[in-house]
């Protein structure tokens, strides 16, 4: 029974370590996703400005 307990504890430690690594990776990916989202919203604002300029140019022609 001693070996079985040792293996269970070892598996528990490995599982906790892998979960911590996964948590770190998830946080990194969430940060990257927020950064990409911020860039996309700026792009949408720029697109709106370009469209309004095009409409003004069409009106001038």
UniProtKB/Swiss-Prot annotation:
Keywords: Membrane, Transmembrane, Transmembrane helix. Its main location: membrane. The chain crosses the membrane at residues 4-23. It is found in: Membrane. GO terms for cellular component: membrane. The keyword Transmembrane helix applies. It is a single-pass membrane protein. This is Uncharacterized protein AF_0697. It comes from Archaeoglobus fulgidus (strain ATCC 49558 / DSM 4304 / JCM 9628 / NBRC 100126 / VC-16).
